[in-house]
Amino acid sequence: MKKIQQLLMLSLISSTLIACGGGGGGGSTPTTSSSPQSSSPASTPSSASSSSIISSSSLSSSLSSSSLSSSSLSSSSASSVSSSSVAASEGNVVIEVDMANGWRGNASGSTSHSGITYSADGVTFAALGDGVGAVFDIARPTTLEDAVIAMVVNVSAEFKASEANLQIFAQLKEDWSKGEWDCLAASSELTADTDLTLTCTIDEDDDKFNQTARDVQVGIQAKGTPAGTITIKSVTITLAQEAYSANVDHLRDLAPSDFPIGVAVSNTDSATYNLLTNSREQAVVKKHFNHLTAGNIMKMSYMQPTEGNFNFTNADAFVDWATENNMTVHGHALVWHSDYQVPNFMKNWAGSAEDFLAALDTHITTIVDHYEAKGNLVSWDVVNEAIDDNSPANFRTTDSAFYVKSGNSSVYIERAFQTARAADPAVILYYNDYNIEQNNAKTTKMVDMVKDFQARSIPIDGVGFQMHVCMNYPSIANISAAMKKVVDLGLLVKITELDVAVNQPHCDAYPANKINPLTEAAQLAQKKRYCDVVKAYLDTVPVNQRGGISVWGTTDANTWLDGLYREQFEDEKISWPLLFDNNYNDKPALRGFADALIGTQCTNTH
């Protein structure tokens, strides 16, 4: 039987063990979570071997981080957990788990639990019975075989008096019989009201944790007839495997002709992945990018939720952060039809079409004026996704409040561009849309719109190709041809929202060709696809017409695609479309992007 090693903490260990800030630091108002979660009945070893003492200096040395910082491990579900820090040490990756997000109560069999409570001290649960504890998730494709879990815990005097034991465990989610149950700390090894570090090595004979298809539930539970409470002060997980490195120092520095290499980020729209508070997000953004797009907070419903009530606080903080870190900002988006992003006062407009257009003028002028004065915002998606997906394509009609309230007319599109130009003569104005890279009827409609604008002197500087593509569709030939049509119009071409979905319900013969788990072959194919797309951009768009390339997100754990296709994916998170994995580690896709920038041949090999 494995023994759990313990450390008597002489004092509260300093921040070398737990990074400050991130996806939820100490000092917040305590909250509770009591979501039930399935669990297999954990075995109860008859005895626990005595533990050796680890010195505080050796533990601090082995777990301290010299780089990177706080953020989240997995996606936005309540059952996912944030990671405060990840650091590489002697070939291993150390995950320091967020103690203010992502935990839940857990119980075996029919035993009930009362959830968990967050506090400045950590995560606390009441030991109501055998198998009651607290758990968090480690998201796929992280593998935990041979990983070492270290938990700093503090048991109450009542728990110590109950002579109950503590057990660290790990389970494959939705396959509850597969778990690590051999780590037990006997009551004799526990001291009341004293911080103790318990460690457990996940080491199963059948390597059941050497998998990437399932999330893993990690936790600690009381065994025996417990009473009292247990507080978990901190958790670190040291992974055995060395993280993949793309050997890219700074992606932004590889771009020819100094065009921007950008990324879309979350802000106050995502507490877990907020760039302003998540230091792991900050680390990867600072390392590789020089141009930022706010995923949501500069859209209309955030900026003017009610008529005349403009809210610049969150967007200003975002722009300020970009400025402080020498990054420019692309504004997204002044006008977008999506129902949840249109303020109710516009959706319910009862006045005339001209009054509605005047209200639109007010919104655009106020926003653009504000950021012209503030500085560092260099371009806007003026109108986003105004063309439908029909063949032949046309402007959106009944599904766009802007079309309907403008008198069942697309006049709002040109009006938006005219108003934005009047507000800021220097800012770059883009029309932005998806699927126009397919060189299809939608592309044709976009080109016709631009030609009409140019003929009538409606100001437009460029076209944003969102570029949400699959592994094989659309073809590089069609992507290049679509961009060439905009080049021939003399406009800037900007890839605004690039991602490459490993799985996508509408292409690559899904679900017949569904990929799960994420294999090395799939990652290398994605590497080549990123390279091919970026190379097509460089080959097609002249230097003076390049608006730059932005990726739509940092980590696979925070991609919009898994939410969009949740039903088709049957709640699996299997799109894996970005440059960094769930733990912010490099993926081969990053290498592929870099290869294209420096002119290296695109391959599906390392």
UniProtKB/Swiss-Prot annotation:
A lipid is attached at C20 (S-diacylglycerol cysteine). Endo-acting xylanase which specifically cleaves internal linkages on the xylan backbone, releasing xylooligosaccharides. Is able to hydrolyze oat spelt xylan, the arabinoxylans from wheat and rye, and glucuronoxylan. Also displays very low activity against xylooligosaccharides. During the xylan degradation process, Xyn10C may act on the soluble xylans and long xylooligosaccharides products released by the secreted xylanases Xyn11A, Xyn11B and Xyn10A. It is an enzyme of class 3 (hydrolase). It is a lipid-anchor. Residues 29-64 have a biased composition (Low complexity). Pathway: Glycan degradation; xylan degradation. It is found in: Cell outer membrane. Residues 91-242 form the CBM15 domain. Gene3D superfamilies: Galactose-binding domain-like, Glycosidases. Its EC number is 3.2.1.8. The gene is xyn10C. This is Endo-beta-1,4-xylanase Xyn10C. It comes from Cellvibrio japonicus.
